[in-house]
Design a protein with these regions (language model features):
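Extended, histidine- and acidic-residue-enriched regions that form the cofactor-binding/catalytic faces
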Residues: 1-110, 116-276
C-alpha cells in the first residue's frame, strides 16, 4: 500500500478504504523563520515526521498521508518580514472541515491531523470538534512539539535560556537534519534570542516551567529578523534526535488513535438533550 495518498489511483484508494485505512493530514505554515531558514519550515517538519511515522507503522496499520496543507494561521506581526502567508482562522477551519468531510464522504473515518505550527492548535481543536458534532466521526490532532521530551531537550540543548522558540536551536537543528541545503548557517546568530522571563508564561520551550497563562509572546519580544531564539548553536545530530523523537511519538499516537477509533465504531451517541 502506498504511503502518499496523492500517488494512489482511485481503485487503490477504494482498496485502502476496504482495509479500514487511516489518513494523516499534515499541516504547517508558510512564514518567516529568521534569515537562515526557509518559510516552509513548519510544514516540512510536520510532513517529514508524518511520512516517516506512517512508513514505520505500515506493517501494523493501513495508513496514508495526504499532501501537506502548507499554510496556516500566522499572527500579523510576522508579516513585517517577506514570506509570510497567513490564512484567517475561519477560512482555515472551513478548509480543513472540507478536507475531513471529503474523506468521510468516501468512507474514511480515521483522520489524524499532524500539526507543525504553533499558531494552529486552537483552530484545529475547533475543526475536530465541529466534525464530531456534525458527522459523529472524531478526528484527532497531534502537534509535533508535544512529542518532544522536555527532559532530553533541557539536558542536550546548547543555547542559553531564551534560545528555543521560533527559527531557534530546535527548528534549525531539525532542518539541518532534513534539508541542510535549505539552511544558511552563516546568518544564524543569537540576535533574536528571547529576553522575557515570565513565570506563568515561559517564552522558552525548553524549560521546566509550566505554562499557566496563554499570551501571544511575540509582542513581548523585539525581533529583528523574524526569529525568536538562538539558532547559532544548532547541530544536525540534535536535529536527528528531535526528528526521531517526533516520529516515535507519532507512532504511539497512530497506534492508540487507530485502536480508539475502532472501539468507537458502531457506538450509539445520544443526539438529544438528557432529562434529569
Amino acid at each position: 500500500m502506498k504511503i502518499r495518498f496523492e500517488e494512489m489511483r482511485s481503485p487503490e484508494i477504494g482498496e485502502f478504504i476496504k482495509k479500514d485505512g487511516m489518513v494523516i493530514v499534515p499541516i504547517g505554515a508558510c512564514e518567516v523563520h529568521g534569515r537562515h531558514l526557509p518559510v516552509i519550515t513548519d510544514t516540512k517538519m510536520a510532513y517529514s515526521a508524518a511520512i516517516d511515522a506512517a512508513e514505520k507503522m505500515s506493517g501494523k496499520i493501513p495508513v496514508s498521508v495526504l499532501p501537506a496543507v502548507w499554510f496556516g494561521y500566522s499572527i500579523s506581526i510576522l508579516k513585517n518580514w517577506p514570506g509570510t502567508i497567513t490564512i484567517r482562522p475561519k477560512v482555515l477551519i472551513d478548509l480543513l472541515y472540507n478536507i475531513c468531510q471529503s474523506l468521510i464522504d468516501m468512507g474514511i473515518d480515521k483522520i489524524l491531523i499532524v500539526n507543525g505550527h504553533g499558531n494552529n492548535p486552537g483552530v484545529l481543536d475547533v475543526v475536530v470538534r465541529s466534525i464530531g458534532d456534525d458527522f459523529k466521526v472524531f478526528p484527532g490532532v497531534a502537534n509535533i512539539f508535544d512529542c518532544w521530551d522536555k527532559g532530553y531537550v533541557m539536558q542536550n540543548r546548547r543555547s542559553k535560556p531564551g534560545g528555543i522558540g521560533h527559527a531557534c536551536e530546535i527548528e534549525t537543528s531539525v532542518l539541518l537534519h532534513l534539508s541542510e541545503d535549505l539552511v544558511d548557517m552563516s546568518v544564524a546568530d543569537s540576535t533574536d534570542i528571547m529576553k522575557s522571563d515570565l513565570q506563568t508564561c515561559p517564552v522558552d520551550w525548553g524549560t521546566s516551567k509550566k505554562r499557566k497563562l496563554y499570551l501571544s509572546t511575540w509582542y513581548l519580544e523585539n525581533s529583528t529578523y523574524g526569529g525568536a531564539g538562538d539558532p547559532s548553536c544548532a547541530t544536525k545530530e540534535f536535529g536527528k534526535a528531535i526528528h526521531n523523537m517526533t516520529v516515535n511519538g507519532l507512532c504511539e499516537v497512530i497506534e492508540e488513535f487507530y485502536r480508539t477509533q475502532q472501539n468507537l465504531k458502531g457506538r450509539k451517541l445520544n443526539r438529544k438533550c438528557q432529562k434529569f
